[in-house]
From Swiss-Prot:
Keywords: Electron transport, Membrane, Mitochondrion, NAD, Respiratory chain, Translocase, Transmembrane, Transmembrane helix, Transport, Ubiquinone. Belongs to the complex I subunit 6 family. Its EC number is 7.1.1.2. The keyword Transmembrane helix applies. It comes from Struthio camelus. It is an enzyme of class 7 (translocase). Core subunit of the mitochondrial membrane respiratory chain NADH dehydrogenase (Complex I) that is believed to belong to the minimal assembly required for catalysis. Complex I functions in the transfer of electrons from NADH to the respiratory chain. The immediate electron acceptor for the enzyme is believed to be ubiquinone. GO terms for cellular component: mitochondrial membrane. It is a multi-pass membrane protein. This is NADH-ubiquinone oxidoreductase chain 6. Pfam families: Oxidored_q3. It is found in: Mitochondrion membrane. GO terms for molecular function: NADH dehydrogenase (ubiquinone) activity. InterPro entries: ComplexI_Subunit6 (IPR050269), NADH_UbQ/plastoQ_OxRdtase_su6 (IPR001457), Nuo/plastoQ_OxRdtase_6_NuoJ (IPR042106). The lineage of its organism: Eukaryota, Metazoa, Chordata, Craniata, Vertebrata.
Length: 173
C-alpha cells in the first residue's frame, strides 16, 4: 500500500508538471485529468471514498468547461506538442525545481509528518467521510449557494469578455 501511495504521489507531480508545461490547451487538459484522477485516488487510499468521488465529479465537470472555453479561445491550426524542444526544456526545469524542493524539504525535516492510510486505523464505528457528508448537507448548504452564485457570475463575466466586438461566444444564429 505504501508503494502504491508513493506511486500516486509521483503521478500527481507528473500531472502538475504536465499542466504547468502545456504548450496548448489540447494537451493541458490531459495533465488536469491525470492530476484529478491521481489526487482522488490518493484520497481514496486515505479512506475518504465519498469526498474522493464528489471531488472527482466536480473536477471533471469543471475541467470540461475550462477545456471547452480554452480551446474555443485559442484554436491553433498547428499546436505545439510536448515533444518540441521548448516544452521539453521547460518540463525538465520544472522537474528539477520539484526535486530541489524535495531535497530541501528532506534537509529541513518537513517530511517527518506521517499520515496513516486505511490499513493503519483498523475498523472504526463511523468512517470520516460519512460524518463529513452530514456536515456537507447541513452547514454547507449556504456556502454552496454562495459558491454557485459566484461561479454563475464568473461564467457571465467570461462570456462577456470573450464576446468583445466580434460577438464571440454569444451570437445570434
Amino acid at each position: 500500500m505504501t508503494y502504491f501511495v508513493m506511486f500516486l504521489g509521483f503521478c500527481f507531480i507528473l500531472g502538475a508538471v504536465a499542466v504547468a508545461s502545456n504548450p496548448s490547451p489540447y494537451y493541458g487538459v490531459l495533465g488536469l485529468v491525470v492530476g484529478s484522477v491521481v489526487g482522488c485516488g490518493w484520497l481514496l487510499s486515505l479512506g475518504v471514498s465519498f469526498i474522493s468521488l464528489a471531488l472527482f465529479l466536480v473536477y471533471l465537470g469543471g475541467m470540461l468547461v475550462v477545456f471547452v472555453y480554452s480551446v474555443s479561445l485559442a484554436a491553433d491550426p498547428y499546436p505545439q506538442a510536448w515533444g518540441s524542444w521548448q516544452v521539453v526544456i521547460y518540463g525538465v526545469g520544472l522537474v528539477l525545481v520539484v526535486l530541489v524542493g524535495i531535497v530541501v524539504g528532506d534537509f529541513v525535516g518537513v517530511w517527518n509528518l506521517w499520515v496513516g492510510t486505511v490499513d493503519y486505523g483498523g475498523l472504526g464505528a463511523v468512517r470520516l467521510d460519512f460524518s463529513g457528508v452530514a456536515l456537507f448537507y447541513s452547514w454547507g448548504a449556504g456556502l454552496f449557494l454562495v459558491a454557485g452564485w459566484g461561479l454563475l457570475l464568473t461564467l457571465f463575466v467570461v462570456l462577456e469578455l470573450v464576446r468583445g466586438l466580434s460577438r464571440g461566444a454569444i451570437r445570434a444564429v
